[in-house]
Amino acid sequence: MPNPVRPAVQLKDIRKNFGNLEVLHGVSLSANEGEVISILGSSGSGKSTLLRCVNMLEVPNAGSVAIMGEEIALEHRAGRLARPKDLKQVNRLRERAAMVFQGFNLWSHQTILQNVMEAPVHVQGRDRKACRDEAEALLERVGIASKRDAYPSELSGGQQQRAAIARALAMRPDVMLFDEPTSALDPELVGEVLKVMRDLAAEGRTMLIVTHEMDFARDVSSRTVFLHQGVIAEEGPSSEMFAHPRTDRFRQFLRRDGGTSH
């Protein structure tokens, strides 16, 4: 059973600049083990940047990031971009916080099975036969076992995203990060990806999800965070936030998006 009080992810006072533009203004957020947190916000609110700071795809200019209690060591240099002090630590923690991208990011020259096996074998150094068996089981679990020998170009967008989820799961991560996983999909393919994500949530997976899927955020996530102009404008239990939004900003956001998935 997940420990409900242990933070799986802890962000403190995260600031991020792109040139002279500060897109995150001291954001703090923690996710306990087993929590599913949806991160909502308009385009440009900083939500994807915040998610990418978790595993150092974007390095914060200030603040701290900890994954499963281990803080990532950052070197802040006057007048220059911050950088991780220890790339080995970053790579190790990236294995614990696996990212699923909007654009799938599958290796085009590898089969789906090879894509899922690649990191466990070559990054984690695990046994190839065991990784193959696990990869096949994961493809079965996400409903694309029949596509194991196909290449990404032969799959629909929904199938590619399910393969990307299987690839992330193959790393045996403690935390799953989803950056708008359905935004690149045709509307009729969104449901098959959300079903896999619902199943993962039901298993007690720790998940941080940047999404525009309002129904998913309301019904599946335990907590919702609403970003506006680089700060958290509202956060709380999802059922309460959607039923009784406390801020005008979030109320307007729900009205504009209709409170339903697209």
UniProtKB/Swiss-Prot annotation:
Keyword annotations from UniProtKB, A to Z: ATP-binding, Cell inner membrane, Cell membrane, Membrane, Nucleotide-binding, Plasmid, Transport
One Gene Ontology cellular component: plasma membrane
Molecular-function GO term, any one: ATP binding
All residue ranges annotated as the ABC transporter domain in the record: 9-254
The keyword ATP-binding is assigned to this record: yes
Binding site for ATP: 41-48
Bilayer disposition of the protein: Peripheral membrane protein
Compartments in which it is found: Cell inner membrane
Induction or repression: By octopine.
Parts of the chain that traverse the membrane: none
SUPFAM superfamilies (alphabetical): P-loop containing nucleoside triphosphate hydrolases
Pfam families according to UniProt: ABC_tran
Annotated Gene3D superfamilies: P-loop containing nucleotide triphosphate hydrolases
Annotated family: Belongs to the ABC transporter superfamily.
Function: Component of the octopine active transport system probably consisting of four subunits: Q, M, P and T.
Name the UniProt record assigns to this protein: Octopine permease ATP-binding protein P
Species: Rhizobium radiobacter
Lineage: Bacteria, Pseudomonadati, Pseudomonadota, Alphaproteobacteria, Hyphomicrobiales
